[in-house]
Structures are given as C-alpha cells and as structure tokens.
C-alpha cells in the first residue's frame, strides 16, 4: 500500500489522459471521457476508481473478478475479464505500469538546492548548480560534482572523485578513487573504490598488494544498497552504461561489466573477470576470478561459474553447466533418490 507519509497522489486522472500519456496503448474505440482514475492497485485490491495491470499470466484469474475500472494487459491477451473493466493492450504492461507510477505519484521528500550547515565541503571541491548536499556529508579536496545532483546525509566523497550530473547518492555511501557518469543512482550504504582483496603469500606471511587503479562507472547506472565495488590493482574496475546492480553485490578488483548487464542480489564476482554486454546473473551467483562471460549470457540463481561462458549461453548449477543439462541432472537425481528409497524400504 502506498503511504501518504512518503508519496503524494497526483490523481484523479482521466482515463483518456492516461491513454495519451502511455502512447503505445491499444484501447477500445469508444471510452467515456468522464471516467476518472484515482489510484493504481493490484487486480485483487482494485476498486471501480482504480487502474491495474497484468504482466504475469499467473494472475490472469483475478482479471475475471477484479473491480478495476481499467487494466493494462499484454498486446496479445485474449482471456476472460470482468466486462466492466476496460482493457488497455500494451506491448509491455510492466513498463507501462512503471510509467504510470510516476504519472500518479510524487515523493513528499524534496531536495532544495542547498549545502546543509553540518556538511564539510573542501574549498577546492567543485559543486555544480542546483545540488543538494545533506547533513554531515564530507566532500574532500578536488572533488567535482555535476549539476542537479543529490548527496544525502552521512555520505563520504573522497579526494579527487568525479561525479556527473543528476546523480542521486543516498545515505551513508562512501566513494573513493572513482569517476562516475551522469544519471547514476547509488543506494544507501554502498561502498565504492576501496582497496581490492589482493595478497601475496611469502614464507607463511600474507603481504598486501597495493591497489592503484580506480573505479569507472558509466551513465545511467543503478547500484543497490550495501553493494561493494573494489578498485583495481593496475587495471580499473569498470561498470558500463545502463547496468543495474542489486543490493549486497560484491564486485572484485579489476572486474569489467558490460553495458546493460543485470546483477542480482548476493552475487559475488572475483577479481579480473569480465562480464559482457546485457548479461544477467541471478541471485547468489558466484563468478571465479579471471573469467570471461560472453555477451548476453545468463547464469541461473546460485550458479557457481568456474570457467568461461560463451556469448548467449544460459547456465545453472554449481559448477555451472548448460541449463538443460542442469535440469536433466536434477530430474535424474530425483529419480535415483526415489529408486534408492524404495529399495531401502524393501
């Protein structure tokens, strides 16, 4: 449920205005201009004043009984629905829903163009226009922060860091040895640019290897809460444009992640591995060091990757193997256990 403590409802909105706003919608030829939509709700909870959406076929049954005034459905949807619900066909209902959220709601919290008195900003730092620097933020020498950026309470921006325009850095983030592009979002508690995990063992003693590289983050990247991205030793750690990195992800020194890749929570990528463009790593995936994951490859949740993966391949299991082989192994193992248990009972 959306709380008015945090978000302001901008409704009601005319259904005709919603259709115009979403653009790529196939709607019935005649829609009453006076239909007013007050809110967005899931199918099960929607009232006659609400709009809903169907992006997962698992919930198709609820479309028969929903009370929603309108529902966004897949373009090819031909199933049953409440006759009182106006169906709006979209190529991607979930994407349309995401746009509607911003059409109906605005956050209550605002960020004025201001540097709070408790913030410590070095004289040599450059702060762009219309920036908000929150309480107890520390910005060290020679930092550059682009226009329209937000640095929330308690964050630390180390010497020489460069952050682009329209950044949103949430609370208690620390950033060192990094160059960050435009339109980047970094959620609370993330740590970027710290020393990598590198040691050389000599005569029983683990000697630290200095990491003198940096972290480079491209444009329009989102980094989740409490994620850690280590700087490289000699080679930089690089996150390319459009990447989405979930909470609690560990990215080791010198890792390179290609454009548009998605890394899900609790994944760990060991040093010097390369992830290609538009790859997907499911939750709790482990990638060993010095590997190459090809463009468009996918690793199922909890996959343990110990060797290179070719472009476009889908793997699962630990050690990770082609996904269909993994499914076959799981079925065979289940059958073997069933047979073994039957023999034991006899």
Curated annotation (Swiss-Prot):
PANTHER family according to UniProt = UDP-3-O-ACYLGLUCOSAMINE N-ACYLTRANSFERASE, UDP-3-O-ACYLGLUCOSAMINE N-ACYLTRANSFERASE 1, MITOCHONDRIAL-RELATED
- What cellular-component terms does GO give this entry? membrane
Classification via NCBIfam families: lipid_A_lpxD, PRK00892.1
What EC number(s) is this enzyme filed under? 2.3.1.191
UniProt keyword terms in alphabetical order: Acyltransferase, Lipid A biosynthesis, Lipid biosynthesis, Lipid metabolism, Repeat, Transferase
* Pathway assigned in UniProt: Bacterial outer membrane biogenesis; LPS lipid A biosynthesis
- A Pfam family the protein falls into: Hexapep
In the record, which residues are listed under signal peptide? none
GO term, biological process aspect, one: lipid A biosynthetic process
Please write the reaction equations for the catalytic activity of this protein. a UDP-3-O-[(3R)-3-hydroxyacyl]-alpha-D-glucosamine + a (3R)-hydroxyacyl-[ACP] = a UDP-2-N,3-O-bis[(3R)-3-hydroxyacyl]-alpha-D-glucosamine + holo-[ACP] + H(+)
| GO MF term list | N-acyltransferase activity
Q: Which residues form the active site?
A: 253 (proton acceptor)
Task: Report the Gene3D superfamilies cross-referenced here.
Answer: Hexapeptide repeat proteins (2.160.10.10), MurE/MurF, N-terminal domain (3.40.1390.10)
Q: Which family does it belong to?
A: Belongs to the transferase hexapeptide repeat family. LpxD subfamily.
What is the documented function of this protein?
A: Catalyzes the N-acylation of UDP-3-O-acylglucosamine using 3-hydroxyacyl-ACP as the acyl donor. Is involved in the biosynthesis of lipid A, a phosphorylated glycolipid that anchors the lipopolysaccharide to the outer membrane of the cell.
Q: Which gene encodes it?
A: lpxD
Question: How does this polypeptide assemble, per the annotation?
Answer: Homotrimer.
Indicate what this protein is called per its UniProt record: UDP-3-O-acylglucosamine N-acyltransferase
């Amino acid at each position: 449920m959306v709380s008015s403590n945090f978000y302001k409802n901008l409704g009601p909105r005319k259904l005709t205005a919603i259709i115009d706003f979403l653009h790529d919608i196939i709607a019935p030829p005649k829609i009453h201009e006076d239909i007013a939509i007050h809110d967005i709700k899931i199918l099960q909870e929607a009232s006659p004043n609400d709009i809903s959406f169907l992006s997962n076929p698992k919930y198709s049954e609820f479309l028969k009984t929903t009370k929603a005034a309108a529902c966004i459905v897949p373009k090819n949807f031909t199933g049953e629905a409440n006759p009182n619900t106006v169906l709006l066909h979209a190529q991607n209902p979930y994407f349309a829903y995401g746009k509607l959220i911003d059409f109906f709601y605005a956050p209550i919290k605002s960020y004025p163009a201001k540097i709070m008195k408790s913030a410590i900003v070095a004289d040599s730092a450059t702060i762009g226009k219309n920036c908000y620097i929150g309480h107890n933020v520390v910005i060290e020498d020679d930092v550059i922060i682009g226009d329209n950026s937000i640095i929330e309470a308690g964050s630390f921006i180390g010497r020489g860091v460069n952050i682009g325009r329209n950044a949103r850095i949430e609370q208690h983030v620390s950033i060192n040895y990094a160059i960050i592009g435009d339109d980047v979002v970094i959620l609370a508690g993330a740590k970027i640019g710290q020393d990598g995990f590198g040691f050389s063992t000599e005569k029983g003693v683990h000697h630290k290897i200095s990491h003198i590289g940096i972290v480079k983050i491209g444009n329009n990247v989102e980094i989740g809460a409490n994620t850690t991205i280590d700087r490289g030793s000699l080679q930089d750690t690089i996150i390319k444009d459009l990447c989405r990195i979930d909470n609690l992800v560990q990215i080791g020194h010198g890792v390179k992640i290609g454009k548009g890749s998605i890394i899900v929570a609790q994944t760990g990528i060991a040093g010097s591995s390369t992830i290609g463009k538009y790859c997907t790593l499911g939750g709790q995936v482990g990638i060993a060091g010095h590997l190459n994951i090809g463009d468009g490859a996918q690793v199922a949740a909890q996959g343990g990757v110990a060797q290179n993966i070719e472009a476009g391949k889908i793997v699962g299991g630990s050690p990770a193997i082609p996904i269909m082989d993994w499914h076959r192994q799981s079925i065979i193992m289940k059958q073997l256990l069933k047979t073994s248990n039957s023999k034991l009972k006899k």
